[in-house]
From Swiss-Prot:
UniProt: (6R)-5,10-methylene-5,6,7,8-tetrahydrofolate binding residues: 195, 294
Keyword Transferase found: yes
Known pathway: Pyrimidine metabolism; dTTP biosynthesis
Documented EC number(s): 2.1.1.45
Organismal lineage: Viruses, Varidnaviria, Bamfordvirae, Nucleocytoviricota, Megaviricetes
Listed NCBIfam families: thym_sym
Organism the protein comes from: Invertebrate iridescent virus 6 (IIV-6)
Superkingdom as given in the UniProt entry: Viruses
This protein's name: Probable thymidylate synthase 225R
Length: 295
């Protein structure tokens, strides 16, 4: 049987943190096992890196990413799609700071991606600012050799007003030379805080999907852009101590073949997608593992 070596690198890192990581106190009071400075790499050309050693909440991955892309910071919009992964953050943020109304997460990812530099007032307001996503798409189409295609979520001016400052902070996109009539789009993500149990599997899938979407909408009649690699740099790599039992089970599982992804909506407008446009094929994961989110 072929071993899924790409998922195996994630499992190897889990094992390293579990058995070699140092014990640390943390903001949540739960405690963690920690290592610092690791990297994973996934080939997006023929498969999609949705982990198989536990079932990953695919609907949540897609809807959260589309919510980020829309620029929304209103958790009720995500709730309407049946996704409640930000609800506890919203409740805690409102209780502790009460800066905005209860469903408002502050100037988190979507706001930074689409309205960078604007003064955040609330989730119901209209904003201008720098549309980083559209700038990246335009650059891919017009100057694919450019080395400044960066998507930034980290904003020191705004971090204190966010329900949670960005864990995945900076994504750098790179376009290859033309090979066999097409170019490849790769993404390198820097993640300052990497929760190996809950966050990282989600983040891998999310930025792999974002790379697929940007490649899709950046393609033109004369220039085909396809996904290349996803490189994931993890800075503070940690496992919460209340996740150890579940993750010990996960590393005992033999990874299966990754699924594939098809985008069936042929439009080139990044704001015009729905979750139905992304078809995941041949996803055969092990059962989900229960882990509580640390706040």
């Amino acid at each position: 049987m072929d071993i899924n070596n790409e998922e195996k690198q994630y499992l190897n890192l889990l094992e390293k943190v579990l058995f070699q990581g140092e014990d640390r106190d943390d903001r949540t009071g739960i405690g963690t096992k920690n290592v610092f400075g690791e990297q994973l790499k996934f080939n997006l050309r023929t498969s999609f890196p949705l982990l198989t050693t536990k079932k990953v909440f695919w609907k949540g991955v897609v809807e959260e990413l589309l919510w980020f892309i829309s620029g929304s910071t209103d958790v009720s919009v995500l709730n309407q799609k049946g996704v409640k992964i930000w609800n506890k953050n919203a409740e805690s943020f409102y209780t502790q700071q009460n800066l905005f109304k209860k469903n408002d997460l502050g100037p988190i990812y979507g706001f930074q991606w689409r309205h960078y530099g604007e003064n955040y007032i609330g989730c119901d307001n209209k904003y201008g600012g720098i549309d980083q996503l559209k700038n990246i798409i335009t650059t891919i189409q017009n100057e694919p050799w450019d080395r400044r295609m960066i998507l930034l979520a980290w904003n020191p001016k705004d971090n204190s007003k966010m329900a949670l400052p960005p864990c995945h902070c900076i994504a750098h996109f790179d376009v290859s030379s033309k090979i066999n009539g097409k170019r490849e789009l790769s993404c390198h993500l820097f993640q300052r805080s990497a929760d190996m149990g809950l966050g990282v599997p989600f983040n891998i899938a999310s930025y792999a999907l974002l790379t697929h979407i940007i490649a899709h909408v950046s393609s033109t009649n004369t220039e085909l852009i396809v996904p290349g690699d996803f490189v994931h740099t993890l800075s503070n790599v940690h496992i919460y101590k209340n996740h150890i039992k579940a993750l010990t089970e996960q590393i005992s599982r033999i990874p299966r073949k990754f699924p594939t992804l098809e985008i069936i909506n042929k439009n080139k407008n990044i704001d015009a997608f729905s979750s139905k446009d992304f078809v995941l094929k041949d996803y055969n994961p092990y059962p989900a593992l229960e882990m509580e989110m640390a706040l």
